[in-house]
């Protein structure tokens, strides 16, 4: 964790910001966690960071490349970028809004690189979003009827 806090400090310093107690706390709350909503992060601060400060910190973290948004339908959750964790994608359940992490997959990465090459693009980053219904929601019929069902 100390190594990652040093990386956080270096990134913030390069971006013109200092490593405050509140910024360190938000980083620690996101470390080794599933993507979290802003509300969930706010609750986990136990009043140590007010809501306005949380939104400012997340905006700074996004601009500096420390965190990224993971979209779940039209809403989003926040997670640390690949600088701090292994590269992965998500499947989001439209029924219960659970996020399922897909660990790095060589086939997906190869396809993305092939598409970038085909379209003469140098890909610097990407996010793959898959939406559907998890096995629990399929079992409990929490998905809309699809044609053919």
Locations of the language-model features?
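Short acidic, hydrophobic short linear motifs in intrinsically disordered regions
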Residues: 36-45
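Short, locally clustered residues in the helix-turn-helix/winged-helix DNA-binding domain
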Residues: 28-32, 46
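Short capping segments at the starts of secondary-structure elements
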Residues: 21, 33-37
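Short alpha-helical segments that sit at the start of domains
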Residues: 2-27
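Non-DNA-binding regulatory cores of transcription-related proteins
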Residues: 64-149
């Amino acid at each position: 964790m100390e190594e990652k806090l040093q990386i956080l400090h270096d990134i913030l310093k390069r971006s013109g910001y200092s490593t405050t107690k509140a910024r360190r706390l938000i980083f620690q709350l996101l470390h080794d966690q599933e993507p979290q909503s802003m509300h969930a992060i706010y609750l986990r601060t136990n009043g140590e960071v007010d809501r306005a400060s949380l939104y400012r910190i997340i905006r700074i973290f996004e601009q500096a490349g420390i965190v990224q948004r993971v979209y779940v339908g039209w809403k989003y959750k926040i997670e640390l970028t690949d600088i701090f964790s292994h590269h992965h994608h998500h499947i989001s359940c439209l029924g219960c809004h659970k996020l399922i992490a897909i660990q790095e997959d060589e086939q997906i990465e190869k396809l993305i690189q092939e598409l970038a090459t085909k379209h003469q693009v140098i890909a610097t980053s990407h996010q793959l979003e898959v939406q559907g219904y998890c096995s629990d929601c399929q079992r409990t019929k929490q998905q809309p009827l699809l044609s053919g069902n």
